């Protein structure tokens, strides 16, 4: 993702700039036997964040049609804060591609670590649940969305 905040030595980014689409605390109910968060729960959180961005752009109902890629970068533990940043990267006639990154933070520390990332495809649907046209992706709309953050 662009606009990342970096450490003072300009090495690894700390997290994307702006406000996350979703911020949650990892809870015990969503863990595996090792005390780490289930991959399925993490993927669901990415899908929710991407869906919020897609629905906001389409101004319509949206459905997930593909999880084009998902990469696990670091484990998420119980009690970690997970911040999900999502952005629109491509728009078709009825579809949208959304890039999402999930960054974990131990609740009593400042450092953030990229835990998961993915690319999702959504389709906008009308009242009859048929694909409907979405607005084009243009600079004016993208700039106004960034100003909202």
Swiss-Prot record:
Domain HotDog ACOT-type: 16-128
Top-level taxon: Bacteria
GO biological process: acyl-CoA metabolic process; fatty acid catabolic process
Hydrolase in keyword set: yes
InterPro entries: Cytosol_ACT (IPR040170), HOTDOG_ACOT (IPR033120), HotDog_dom_sf (IPR029069), Thioestr_dom (IPR006683)
Gene3D superfamilies reported in the protein's UniProt record: Hotdog Thioesterase
EC number: 3.1.2.-
Entry's Gene Ontology molecular function annotations: long-chain fatty acyl-CoA hydrolase activity
PANTHER family: ACYL COENZYME A THIOESTER HYDROLASE, ACYL-COA THIOESTER HYDROLASE YCIA
Protein known as: Uncharacterized acyl-CoA thioester hydrolase ZMO0511
